């Protein structure tokens, strides 16, 4: 799996959060960072969108993280992720910058994902996504990490 995201993680806490889960995942979650755009907001969005699409492998199954994307509870997301991983295509998650994802990125996406209706900092999303991917894989494998729904 691959996370293709706009900008470089400079904050150690954000980087450590991402790495804590990304390194424990199987398949591993690799991070590809593309440059932040410059200029007016529309130009930034366009440039960042082009950079995201350029970093996306040709046959990839692209999942765009977007506030208008599909929201899942943890069990449903585990099922969806297993389906994506079974496609025999590289699964790539796309995270835009502060201006969001450009239209062509959303058009190229095979699916969309929302981590809820709140707006999250795009650097923090990396760690949140890595944790949710780890949780989904734990659910699928029967690992005790996910505790929701267990009897008290």
UniProtKB/Swiss-Prot annotation:
Location relative to the cell: Cytoplasm
Gene3D superfamilies referenced in this protein's UniProt entry, alphabetically: 3.40.1280.10
Keywords for this protein: Cytoplasm, Methyltransferase, rRNA processing, S-adenosyl-L-methionine, Transferase
Protein name: Ribosomal RNA large subunit methyltransferase H
Recorded name of the encoding gene: rlmH
Database matches in CDD domains: RlmH-like (cd18081)
UniProt xrefs under Pfam families: SPOUT_MTase
Cellular component aspect of the GO annotation: cytoplasm
């Amino acid at each position: 799996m691959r996370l293709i995201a706009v900008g470089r993680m400079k904050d150690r806490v954000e980087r450590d959060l991402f790495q804590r889960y990304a390194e424990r995942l199987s398949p591993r979650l690799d991070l590809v960072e593309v440059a932040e755009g410059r200029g007016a907001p529309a130009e930034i969005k366009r440039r960042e969108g082009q950079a995201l699409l350029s970093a996306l492998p040709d046959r990839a199954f692209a999942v765009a993280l977007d506030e208008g994307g599909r929201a899942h509870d943890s069990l449903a997301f585990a099922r969806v992720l297993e389906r994506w991983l079974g496609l025999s295509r590289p699964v790539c998650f796309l995270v835009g910058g502060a201006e969001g994802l450009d239209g062509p990125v959303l058009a190229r996406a095979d699916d969309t994902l929302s981590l809820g209706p709140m707006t999250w900092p795009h650097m923090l999303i990396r760690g949140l996504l890595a944790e949710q991917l780890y949780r989904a894989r734990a659910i699928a494998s029967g690992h005790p990490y996910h505790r929701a729904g267990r009897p008290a």
